[in-house]
Amino acid sequence: MEGTFLGKPRDLGYAKRVFKKKLISLWPTTAARTAAMILGGVAVVGALVVAGGHGAWTGLVAARLAQGKKPRLEDFIVEGQWHAALISAVVCAVLALTASWWLPVAAVARCRPAPERPWRRWFWVGLAAVVVAGGVVRLPRLSHSLYNDETYTFRRYVAGDHKRQPDGTREWRPVSWKATLWGNQMANNGVPYSLAARAAYDFAVSRGWARAMLPAEVPLRLPALLAGLGSLVVIALLARRWGGAWAGMIAATVAAVHPWHVRYSTEARSHSLVLLFAPLLPLVLDRAVACGRLRWWAAFAATEVMLLWAFAGSLYFLVAFNGLALVWLWRRGDGVWRTFLAAHLVAAAVYLHLMAPCLPQMRQAIRDNPVFSAGISWEWALTTGSFLLTGMPWLNGNPEMASHPSLQRVWVEFPAAVMLLLLSAAALVGAGVRRVGSDPSGRVLAFSLPLAAVLAVTATLASGTLLISWYMLYLLPAGLVLAAVGSVALVQAARRRGGFAARAALSVVVLAWLGWTTVIASPLMTYRKMGKQALREVARFLAVPVNGVSPLAVTHRTEAIVYDPSLYSLEMDLVDLRRLLAQSDAEGRPLLVAFGYRDLILHETPEFLQAIEESGDFERVAHFPGLEEPQFAQNIWRHRPRPPSQP
């Protein structure tokens, strides 16, 4: 078929050749054309979803609120996925059109090995031994009772809950997979952990290793343990990148026994994933920049997604790290910053599909729940610094427990030793910053840590929200890396120079680690033998007959009921308590009342505490202390039934 165009004959074959030429000019390489086709296809699918769902899938949450109703999880899911599809369609379309601009065209030719460090066999054997030892150190913590936040995750995101019915009975309501993946009513669902914990728990139940509908600590904590042990390997590799094999071994060994790492790598929440992915991010970026292959950039994007998916508070670290990394890559002048930006856009699109339904729930929880408006004080800096350095708080938050770990107590008893520890630790970290600072990627990591802390504190002060010390957990792995690299750097400098300088450097290293090991012994042993809340122990105590008589056991302000759904949950007023007292006397059964959060009860219903503790009708028969705060202590009081009055 022929025709004319601008006075010249044209046929279909010529048009095809022109189109092909234009196509090649836009996407000159096979890789660019392949990327454009894949991304373009995703953009088309997203556009179809947006067009098909417009109107029907939007405004669902607002409509429910306008009707005075609580939005359903399905409303958040549908509306969130629609918005995610809209944004991802735009992102993929832009990336498809600009594929030749951001794609590393000469990736294979430019690929070069990372700064070479000989992979000695002893390093891997030693690292394996450290990982095994780290597992042994953490093993006792797997069987500790769950504490309040862990029970919330179990009830809302992993297994289910026994809901109290109007007649007083309890009905088991299992958690749906939608709730595991997208439920976030209290802004505390670390989704990757919840998915892994649910798989482990369901498998344990199916094999008969755990009882259905009841907590099983080991399966619930196993995903956290595996991620925590994996973080030891990543920390070792990151330290090895700048300090050699010995720095890697030191960093892994210190992380294996650091009380904060030990504790949060064994809690049934998503903390251990932060310990894993925070140090993995700079390691993968370093390799992606050195090699340039798309698989490394994909790994970098995936690491970002996993870190932010596990804990949204990691955003400050990501902003600081990626902002500095962008400046570094832009100054290189080889265009790799364009691939860096593209990886971020892909990560953002994927993250939105994973978290778009959760974000409105999190915003609503932070806005409406008073606990998120606590703010921070100057003591926060002392506490956070103490946790990062020694794994224990600065103040003893639970004065009733004299042996509770507290760096302030050590300071009062041995001020010179603590000061020496602080100075030597600062020297090690400073030497580490100087060593890694000789490399641009090392400077990015070193300076992103204080910048992330500043961003977190500034945002918290500006918004008046909450900033708990463990929110800064992403600082710990890199801090240990800097200290380990600094130790090796000082020793190497001492060996080169000799004389007094050598002895001084060696003294700093030895005193730092010797003093640190001495200080962390107490919190490490405490965390190994003691959980945060003894909820399981409370449930077991309440189930034991008193003088051969089954007690009338009730709970108030304690999550122990998750271990025994048959326990009666006492209401907030005294009417229920008086009724139970009368029932105890009538049936001749001792009444046991278990409660926690004493300070909260004292503030909300002081008459309840007065009736229990001051009336003389009750005696305390058990007390289970908790870690960090008095509210985690569990108290059990017993009322002896009065004999019926004689006529």
What are these regions (language model features)?
Residues 11-34, 102-122, 435-440, 495-499:
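Membrane-interfacial, low-structure loops and terminal tails that flank and connect transmembrane helices
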Residues 2, 19-20, 241:
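N-terminal hydrophobic targeting signals that begin at the initiator methionine
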